[in-house]
Amino acid sequence: MSLKPALIDGADIRERLRVDHQRFLEELDEVCTVTDERRSQARLQELRRGWRVHALTEEMVVYRALEGVDATASSGNRADDRFAEHELVEAMFDKLSCLTPHMHEWQARLDVLLSLLQRHVDTDHFEMFPRLAERFDAAQLAELGEQFALARDKLTLLEELKAA
């Protein structure tokens, strides 16, 4: 995934997340079509860095905001599920980085990664987005979007420096 954030000024947090999610799914599909092994691994590593930025930013901004207004035990368990989901995706990236692209196991694990990412997207869109809409007004959602963009930009810069 390109670490360069999409320019969507004034967008609320849900739109910023939708854009990130769409880019992840599209770029993961592209990894499947690259036939050169080195390019496949390079694309996968770029996507992994983008995922790391997205996940950390989502945890710092969105989950923290929801935890601040959701003090119930069940919502705490759901937050734990989301953190675990992020860890599963990262673990799958670990496994893929040790495999030869386009071999049977690599493709199988790539399919699992796609399923995990799709589950993450669906959970965000169908569970978290409605909760955000219930708990925050338009101005607050826009502010969360700005906080997300700022945090994402900072983490992106750090990831780029680490990769250089």
Segments from the language model and where they lie:
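Small-residue-biased structural context
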Residues: 1-164
